[in-house]
């Protein structure tokens, strides 16, 4: 199972090296890693996705807390949260495929950031499912390059799961169109 950990650390030189060294020594793999400044000066937030059962995640957490600059660790896997990734994707295009690709981009609210006779580069932001879906749809056109950030996430204060919000929106949209009761 994939787990998402949110780790607050002091913004000091070598912190990320010590964390990645710990993972390497223990034989753990990091699927996704994103690091950036947190809400407080001098503090960074690391969002990492790791594969493992609860026992492995507990073990990783204990080892991380032993590192000097680690302040707080939270496994947010089963907590309602907002998750986002950013992907830049370069796709082969020609005059006959361009409109189809632009239509897909429009549906996914992707932005065209570069366009030439032979290629198009799109910028897509969304949850990991949205990113995977557009990538899958664009495969048939010929993906040349992909650059993807790691997942970033913050817990929801409303404690409402994204899937519940999405389902509720679909039901309400259906009622507006006259399909509901």
From Swiss-Prot:
Lineage: Eukaryota, Rhodophyta, Bangiophyceae, Galdieriales, Galdieriaceae
UniProtKB keywords: Amino-acid biosynthesis, Branched-chain amino acid biosynthesis, Chloroplast, Plastid, Transferase
Enzyme nomenclature, EC number: 2.2.1.6
Quaternary structure and interacting proteins, as annotated: Dimer of large and small chains.
InterPro entries linked: Acetalactate_synth_ssu, Acetolactate_synth/TF_NikR_C, Acetolactate_synth_ssu_C, ACT-like_dom_sf, ACT_dom, AHAS_ACT, AHAS_small-like_ACT
Biochemical pathway: Amino-acid biosynthesis; L-isoleucine biosynthesis; L-isoleucine from 2-oxobutanoate: step 1/4; Amino-acid biosynthesis; L-valine biosynthesis; L-valine from pyruvate: step 1/4
GO BP annotations, alphabetical order: isoleucine biosynthetic process; L-valine biosynthetic process
Source domain of life: Eukaryota
CDD domains (UniProt xref): ACT_AHAS (cd04878)
Cellular compartments annotated: Plastid, Chloroplast
GO molecular function list: acetolactate synthase activity; acetolactate synthase regulator activity
Alphabetized PROSITE patterns for the sequence: ACT
Protein name: Acetolactate synthase small subunit
GO cellular component: chloroplast; cytosol
Similarity remark: Belongs to the acetolactate synthase small subunit family.
Catalyzed reactions per annotation: 2 pyruvate + H(+) = (2S)-2-acetolactate + CO2
Organism: Galdieria sulphuraria (Red alga)
Domain ACT: 4-78
């Amino acid at each position: 199972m994939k787990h998402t950990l949110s780790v607050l650390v002091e913004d000091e030189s070598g912190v990320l090296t010590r964390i990645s060294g710990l993972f390497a020594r223990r034989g753990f793999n990091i699927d996704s890693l994103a690091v950036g400044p947190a809400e407080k000066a001098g503090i960074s937030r690391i969002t990492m996705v790791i594969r493992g059962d609860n026992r492995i995640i507990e073990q990783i957490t204990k080892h991380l807390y032993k590192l000097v600059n680690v302040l707080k660790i939270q496994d947010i896997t089963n907590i309602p949260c907002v998750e986002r990734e950013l992907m830049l994707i370069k796709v082969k295009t020609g005059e006959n495929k361009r409109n189809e690709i632009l239509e897909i981009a429009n549906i996914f609210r992707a932005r065209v950031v570069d366009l030439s006779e032979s290629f198009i580069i799109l910028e897509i932001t969304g949850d990991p499912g949205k990113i995977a879906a557009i990538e899958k749809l664009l495969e048939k056109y010929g993906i040349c390059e992909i650059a993807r950030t790691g997942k970033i996430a913050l817990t929801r204060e409303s404690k409402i799961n994204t899937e519940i919000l999405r389902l509720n929106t679909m039901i309400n949209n259906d009622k507006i169109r006259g399909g509901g009761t």
